[in-house]
A protein has these predicted regions:
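Short beta-strand-centered aromatic/proline hotspots
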Residues: 166-172
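Short amphipathic alpha-helix segments
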Residues: 66-86
């Protein structure tokens, strides 16, 4: 195999092949022309053009989250990307703090939804999804997704005052939390609507922002 460069875009490739078939020696020579063309992959083009399909808005309810808490929430996205099958659209277009929270703009709606599910399972809270139509292609609507995630103002193990008594969230459920009464070890389920008026009175592992 010999490569002979003709110019910056064309190369002649000379190939010699030999083989023995039924004790007979065969030899062949071939020449082909290879042409190089510059191109950019679709994903690279989209990333360079600030393409995005979804925005995840990290917010809080009841109290203002600290920078550390927002950083911890943001780091969970890296874990989600690692655990999901490789997809060239799983990229971050831009991100940064905004008034009242932190926004992450993503190249994939599927990634945004997976992250939202992960946030709820690990940190509780609620996700509100809205979809907007931004155009049409091949007869189908092109849409963008906005996920608003609100983290509760307390974590598992914290003590909250709810319905005049002290409770401790022990686990998150799909629509709320399982809470345990501090005095009697009584357990019950509560939806986020039920917990709207709950106030945290003791934090286990938290330094509140000043």
């Amino acid at each position: 195999l010999v490569a002979q460069e003709v110019d910056g875009r064309h190369t002649l490739i000379h190939i010699e092949m030999e083989g023995i078939i039924d004790n007979l020696l065969y030899a062949e020579r071939h020449t082909m022309r290879a042409r190089m063309s510059n191109g950019v992959c679709l994903t690279c083009t989209r990333r360079a053009g600030n393409y995005f399909e979804a925005t995840v808005q990290l917010r809080s309810s009841a109290r203002r989250l600290s920078e550390k808490e927002f950083s911890e929430l943001r780091l969970t996205l890296d874990k989600v990307i690692i655990e999901m099958p490789d997809d060239p659209m799983f990229f971050i277009t831009k991100e940064g703090p905004v008034t009242g929270g932190y926004d992450v703009v993503l190249g994939s709606k599927a990634l945004a939804r997976a992250w939202g599910r992960h946030l709820i399972s690990k940190h509780g809270g609620q996700v509100t999804a809205t979809t907007s139509v931004v155009g049409r292609k091949d007869g189908a609507d092109l849409t963008r997704l906005t996920l608003l995630y609100r983290k509760p103002g307390y974590a598992l193990g914290d003590v909250i005052r709810w319905r005049g008594e002290l409770w401790r969230p022990s686990s998150w459920s799909g629509e709320g939390a399982i809470v345990e009464k501090v005095e009697k070890r009584e357990r019950t389920g509560a939806t986020w609507r039920d917990l709207e008026n709950a106030n945290a009175v003791s934090y286990t592992h938290l330094t509140l922002p000043t």
